[in-house]
Swiss-Prot record:
Reactions it catalyzes: L-lysyl-[protein] + 3 S-adenosyl-L-methionine = N(6),N(6),N(6)-trimethyl-L-lysyl-[protein] + 3 S-adenosyl-L-homocysteine + 3 H(+)
UniProt keywords, alphabetically: Cytoplasm, Methyltransferase, S-adenosyl-L-methionine, Transferase
Residues the entry annotates as binding S-adenosyl-L-methionine: T145, G166, D188, N229
This enzyme's EC code(s): 2.1.1.-
The organism's place on the tree of life at top rank: Bacteria
InterPro entries in the record: Ribosomal_L11_MeTrfase_PrmA (IPR050078), Ribosomal_PrmA_MeTrfase (IPR004498), SAM-dependent_MTases_sf (IPR029063)
Listed name of the protein: Ribosomal protein L11 methyltransferase
Location in the cell: Cytoplasm
Keyword tRNA processing: no
Gene expressing this chain: prmA
Source organism per UniProt: Pseudoalteromonas translucida (strain TAC 125)
Amino acid sequence: MAWIQIRINANADNADLISDLLVEAGSASVTFIDAKDTPIYEPKIGTVQFWADTTVIGLFDANHDMDSVVALLNADKSVAQNLTYKIEQLEDKDWEREWMDNFHPIQFGKRLWICPSWRDIPDPDAVNVLLDPGLAFGTGTHATTALCLKWLESQDLTGKTVVDFGCGSGILGIAAIKLGAERMIGIDIDPQALEASLDNANRNGVADKLEVYLPENQPEFSADIVVANILAQPLRELHSVILGLLKPGGKIAMSGILTEQAQSVADVYAPFIELDDIAIEGDWTRVSGTKKA
């Protein structure tokens, strides 16, 4: 299917309004990107923060009347005042297929492979996790996921109960089961993540060992292992909740933490866990340790 897109120069004050206008004009999707490489590391929970210079991209069917889109934008005085845009015809290609073609099997440690469900397995004798990310985050390609997978691969998980706090696609939990865990509990605030986790667990033949819950529905339990690949701020703010899932002597690994945030996370957990050395991969880190008795 062919598409046409409009790229609009925006700022933190009007990006959301421009997005609403594009949706009103019939946009199939709206994307925000940083126009000047000014990273926003971590907005407050429940908020959306835009860059000072933001590019808003609206995607439309190739036959859409783009003059009507521009007219709608110009009709709003606050947008029209400094409206700068570019309309581009996109190449007709199968974008989903292109993404699939660029997602390859990845090895973590000595035993573990994460394999797209549509690819051949490189090593049938290895611990293989077949993954179809679907609508949830987690393919193994991001440094934070990789840091957690490498840590799990290094642990003795045989017969253990493992919690994945913020389970996303289920990649960490399924890997834990494949590495020997007896019971896996995935917790996420997004129902789509729970659905993706269950789908991937079925694909890997481990659904009988996986339980998934929204936070408000989770039962009481005490786990041997907790992994939490979320963000530094919720890791700090929810430390009592996360630690409450872990039995004394249990092990925890946390990521989604930028290098400059690692010490602040470690400081919050230090009274409660014996910390390991902080692991670093690129701009990201992993904080791990063992819960004190």
